[in-house]
A protein has these predicted regions:
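Cysteine-dependent hydrolase recognition
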Residues: 94, 100, 118
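Aromatic- and Gly/Pro-rich donor/ligand-binding loops
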Residues: 103
Length: 178
């Protein structure tokens, strides 16, 4: 993924680009996901989304876009509630997030409450005003960094947040025990 802050682009737009590098001849799709505030849901080990042949990227009515890149982690403390979360994170974020910051808060809540069951992943979220990179490892640990308005960041399927200052809440978020 590539994320450019609004002062790093000619027209002042926040730009998010992502290519899917899965094997085979795959054409990634982007979906406009309507708002959904469901009172309850069913639990599945694997989730299929009705009407979606594949699930690559999402954009909602508030202009919040979310994509993800696999990142291998060495976290060995598997800690899940109700099977943890995995592929459904993008859909849940697209259904509820009103901003990129809100998307990161939702991801953090999901990881802290349920645990992330994949090896690791970086979610990249953007709205018309800002972009964030949110890194997860297996279990309940996550960290996120706001991409500065004058910066372009590339996320090449490995973790790229280097230094974290959780006291700087305008630019960082994460698990309390990071």
């Amino acid at each position: 993924a590539v994320l450019a802050g609004r002062n790093a682009t000619v027209d002042g737009s926040v730009l998010l680009a992502h290519n899917e590098d899965d094997s085979g001849e795959q054409m990634p799709n982007i979906y406009n996901v309507p708002r959904n505030d469901a009172a309850g849901t069913n639990k599945y080990l694997w989730i299929e989304f009705p009407g979606m042949a594949v699930s690559d990227g999402y954009l909602n009515e508030y202009g919040v876009a979310v994509v993800s890149d696999a990142c291998n982690s060495r976290e060995d403390r598997e800690d899940f509630t109700d099977g943890g979360v995995l592929y459904e994170v993008r859909t849940l974020v697209a259904q509820k997030a009103r901003s990129a910051r809100h998307a990161v808060e939702l991801i953090g809540e999901l990881v802290e409450e349920r645990g992330y069951r994949g090896s690791g992943r970086t979610y990249v979220v953007a709205d018309p005003y800002e972009g964030w990179v949110c890194a997860l490892v297996k279990g309940r640990h996550w960290v996120a960094q706001r991409v500065p308005d004058d910066m372009v960041m590339t996320i090449p399927n490995y973790y790229c947040i280097n230094e974290v200052n959780l006291a700087d809440t305008a630019n960082f978020m994460g698990s309390p025990d990071i």
